[in-house]
Regions:
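Hinge/lid segment of periplasmic solute-binding proteins
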Residues: 68-77, 144-198, 214, 223, ...
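A structural signal for short loop-to-beta-strand junctions that line the ligand-binding cleft
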Residues: 127-130, 135-140, 168-207, 351-356, ...
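Long, aromatic- and glycine/proline-rich binding clefts that accommodate carbohydrate-like moieties
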Residues: 175, 340-347, 392-444, 469-475
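Extracytoplasmic/periplasmic solute-binding protein
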Residues: 181, 185-194, 199, 223-272, ...
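Short, solvent-exposed loop/beta-turn-alpha elements that line the ligand-binding surface or hinge
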Residues: 75-76, 160-175, 234, 239-244, ...
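Glycine-centered hinge/linker elements that transmit conformational signals in sensory
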Residues: 225-230, 268-299, 345
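Extracytoplasmic/periplasmic substrate-recognition and gating elements
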Residues: 130, 211, 284, 289-294, ...
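Extracytoplasmic "Venus flytrap"/periplasmic binding protein-like
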Residues: 99-175, 206-217, 307-309, 313-317, ...
Length: 475
């Protein structure tokens, strides 16, 4: 018997697709009909055959995009952009420069930071922006004194629209109104406050205990304490320091003492008043402190010298910047963390204001930048957002209220100094001329070349001549 087998598909038609790796084959039954031809008749037989079928399963997976708050979280601009920043170096501004450089990791953004000594950085800004034309800088670091000088001259861009635009996104209300006021002229906001600062007392608690000294409340107390410790004490470089190592340093110390005596730089007509009785008293008190506590060597003892001397135990006390105080609680920098203590700045007059000024540092955008101000502002804000300032609070005095708990042990002393101190510079462009002329003549008192009266009168005469030429005083 010849048997011919014809296969007919009578069951399911299986559509096969690519399976996911995790899917397992499914067994199904296929019915096949077999036709068998026999002699004289045709017989149809039905046979069930098991085959494997692959099942395709589509699985939807939601993947969370994790944003690292410590990084610069900006979208890449369409075209390559180079941003240049200039400022001056101290620990907290070094930190912010590193935060700015994080935006260098964003595709098409290149960030260059240039940190110089303060006087050098300010001079570079003046030279670059006073000439007109395109600014070589996109981000400029300035402090209170530069607001009146640089923004008042029209060199800086008002940022009101950008502050309003990004107020919620970057929680700019977390920065106190007083800090914004410090960078505002006639309603125009010219910068983002990134640093709070003042000068306050830093001292060795163990040394003061050893000599039976209380924390000084006035500079007369400081002078008395220096007499107890001794200017010629072999254990120390000197008993106490203020900073008179440069012209700009003399001017800052003089400003604090002058205001504490009730004086000021200018009257309502921009005529000088700093050479009057309060000014003479201020210079005389500075010299009295220097002679009693520092000696001639102290006149050249700069900020870095003072900081290191405190850290290695060669200086019992100083009135120093809060921005430097953070290093005093760093065990990697000093073995004296447990005995270094902090107090508000002394007064020059009992029950008068503390001889400590209030400062902020700002990032500003030059008016003639060639890059997109919106992008520049966002780069600044990525460097000064809440997480950045939380980390920065461990290094210096930042501006956001929400991160105060992360700051160092000096913050209470710094805050009390600001609250009870002499305030900020007036935001008058003419004040920049005053500061420059005082920085020129006051050091001559320290060298003995001029008396306090002679130096102040010389500075006043030079100021009047320059301010008149520039139109700040009617001729």
């Amino acid at each position: 018997m010849r048997k011919h087998k014809f296969w007919l598909l009578a069951g399911l038609v299986v559509a096969l697709s690519l399976a996911l790796a995790a899917c397992q084959p499914e067994t199904v039954t296929v019915v096949e009909t077999v036709v068998v031809e026999k002699e004289g008749e045709t017989v149809v037989e039905t046979v069930e055959v098991e085959v494997e079928k692959e099942v395709v399963v589509t699985e939807v997976v939601e993947k969370e995009v994790i944003v690292d708050p410590t990084e610069c979280n900006l979208d890449a601009p369409a075209e390559e952009v180079e941003l240049n920043m200039i400022g001056w170096s101290f620990p907290i501004t070094d930190f912010y420069a590193e935060e700015l450089r994080k935006c260098d990791k964003v595709e098409n953004i290149n960030v260059n930071t240039n940190l110089l000594a303060s006087a050098d950085a300010q001079e570079q800004v003046r030279l670059a922006l006073s000439a007109g034309g395109d600014s070589p800088y996109d981000i400029v670091h300035g402090a209170n004194a530069q607001v009146g000088e640089w923004a008042g001259a029209g060199w800086m861009m008002p940022l009101n629209d950008l502050v309003d635009k990004y107020w919620d996104e970057y929680n700019l209300g977390d920065i106190p109104e007083k800090a914004w006021e410090g960078v505002t002229i006639d309603g125009n906001i010219y910068g983002v406050p990134i640093v709070g600062n003042t000068l306050h007392l830093i001292y060795r608690q163990d040394v003061y205990d050893e000599y039976g000294l209380d924390v000084p409340e006035t500079y007369d107390d400081v002078i008395e304490d220096c007499g107890v410790i001794g200017l010629d004490n072999p254990d120390f470089d000197m008993p106490f320091t203020i900073n008179l190592s440069a012209g700009w340093a003399w001017e800052i110390e003089f400003f604090q003492f002058l205001r504490a005596y009730g004086g000021d730089y200018l009257d309502e007509n921009n005529m000088p008043t700093f050479q009057e009785e309060e000014g003479v008293k201020a210079v005389e008190k500075l010299v009295e402190v220097a002679d009693a506590c520092m000696g001639m060597d102290g006149y050249s003892f700069g900020l870095n010298d003072q900081e290191v001397a405190m850290q290695i135990g060669l200086l019992p006390g100083t009135n120093m910047w809060a921005s430097r105080a953070a290093n005093m609680s760093d065990p990697e920098r000093t073995d004296l963390v447990d005995v270094i203590a902090y107090a508000p700045a002394p007064r020059v007059v009992e029950d008068g204001p503390r001889a400590g000024s209030a400062w902020n540092d700002f990032y500003m955008i030059p008016a003639n930048t060639t890059n997109d101000p919106d992008l520049i502002f966002r780069v600044i804000m990525e460097a000064a957002d809440e997480r950045s300032q939380r980390d920065g609070a461990e290094i210096g005095m930042v501006t956001r209220l929400s991160v105060a708990e992360y700051g160092g042990p000096y913050l209470e002393a710094a805050g009390q100094t600001i609250a009870e101190g002499i305030g900020i510079y007036d935001k008058d462009q003419a004040v920049g001329i005053v500061r420059a002329r005082l920085g020129e003549f006051l050091p001559l008192v320290g060298t003995g070349e001029m008396t306090p009266e002679e130096a102040l009168n010389a500075a006043a005469d030079a100021y009047i001549e320059e301010a008149t030429a520039q139109g700040f005083i009617d001729g």
